Amino acid sequence: MSFLSCEEMLAAARSQNISLSEAILRSDLAESRLTEAHSREMMHHLWQVMQATSRDYDPAQRSRSGLSGGDAAKVEQAHQEGKSLGGDYLAAVTAEALKTAECNACMKRIVAAPTAGSCGVLPAVLLPLARSGEADEESICDALYVLSLIHISEPTR
């Protein structure tokens, strides 16, 4: 993307009277030579991978070292038993972050955004929003465009 900061992209979106996600999409299309349909298809695929990582979580699976695995299920169980701090959303975010990290450690699906160390952050925030009905798939994909700007501009700040 030709924008080096979120501030620049926000200014561009405001000046064109379009959403931030639309401005990011347009910038990406101008640089990538992708069609809008293909770009959106790729975002939907990323979202589907995040969903599959959660859906296919196996609490019995362990990493090769045996150090990682099963913790997301423990968090979910503690919440169901009323032993967790925070509300439903915080418990869901915590469990989803662990599911993704454990899936990465077990070499199933790799969700690296922007690195494997932060792999669970995006799915952790987005999956509970989608499940609660607070965000539909298009809104999630728009959020992924915005998050891509943050990822791209962060190293330059």
Question: Where are each of the predicted segments found?
Answer:
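Active-site-adjacent structural elements in folded domains
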Residues: 107-110, 157
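Beta-strand segments within the central parallel beta-sheet cores of soluble alpha/beta enzyme folds
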Residues: 136-148
